C-alpha cells in the first residue's frame, strides 16, 4: 500500500501545498521526500495540513489578484516585431516564445514560458496575432502581437520624413 503524503509545496501534476496525496514509491523516495516537497502523513502532520491550506488560500488570493492585474495590463499592450523577409514576404525564422517574453519585459510585463501553451511553436507569418496565455489561478489573457517586415518599417519612416519635410 502506498503511504499518504502531505505536500509542503505545490508539485506540478500531483497537487498543491496542504493536499493529502498518494504517489508511486520511487517518486516519493527519490524526489518528494529528499527535496522537502512532502512528508509522510501522520497525526502530527495532519494538524500541519490546516495551516498549510490556510497559507495556500492566502497565496492563491494574492496570485489571482496579481494575475488579474497582469491580464489588464496585457489588454492595452501590442508587441511590435520587425522581421526580415524575402521578396515574397516569407519570414526568415520565426517570432519565438523567448522573443515575446523579451519584448514583454521591455514593456514592463513579466512573463515566463509556463504562461504560454506547450503547443505554441512560434509565429511564422506577418500580420496581427493573438496568443492565449495561462496565468496563475486559472486566469487567462491574450497577448497581442504585430509582426511586420523590415521594409514596411523603412517605408513608414520614409513617409513620415516626407510628410515632415512638406509640412
UniProtKB/Swiss-Prot annotation:
Pfam families: Ribosomal_L9_C, Ribosomal_L9_N. PROSITE patterns: RIBOSOMAL_L9. Disulfide bonds: none annotated. GO terms for molecular function: rRNA binding; structural constituent of ribosome. Binds to the 23S rRNA. Belongs to the bacterial ribosomal protein bL9 family. This is Large ribosomal subunit protein bL9. It comes from Chlamydia trachomatis serovar L2 (strain ATCC VR-902B / DSM 19102 / 434/Bu).
Amino acid at each position: 500500500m502506498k503511504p499518504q503524503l502531505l505536500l509542503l509545496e505545490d508539485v506540478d501534476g500531483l497537487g498543491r501545498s496542504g493536499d493529502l496525496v498518494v504517489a508511486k514509491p520511487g517518486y516519493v523516495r527519490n524526489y518528494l521526500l529528499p527535496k522537502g516537497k512532502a512528508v509522510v502523513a501522520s497525526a502530527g502532520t495532519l494538524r500541519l495540513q490546516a495551516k498549510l491550506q490556510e497559507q495556500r488560500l492566502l497565496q492563491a488570493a494574492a496570485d489571482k489578484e496579481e494575475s488579474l492585474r497582469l491580464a489588464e495590463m496585457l489588454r492595452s499592450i501590442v508587441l511590435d516585431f520587425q522581421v526580415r523577409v524575402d521578396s515574397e514576404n516569407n519570414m526568415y525564422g520565426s517570432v519565438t516564445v523567448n522573443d515575446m517574453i523579451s519584448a514583454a519585459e521591455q514593456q514592463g510585463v513579466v512573463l515566463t514560458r509556463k504562461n504560454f501553451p506547450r503547443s505554441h511553436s512560434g509565429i511564422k507569418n506577418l500580420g496581427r496575432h493573438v496568443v492565449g496565455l495561462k496565468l496563475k489561478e486559472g486566469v487567462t489573457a491574450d497577448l497581442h502581437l504585430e509582426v511586420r517586415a523590415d521594409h514596411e518599417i523603412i517605408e513608414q519612416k520614409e513617409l513620415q520624413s516626407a510628410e515632415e519635410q512638406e509640412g
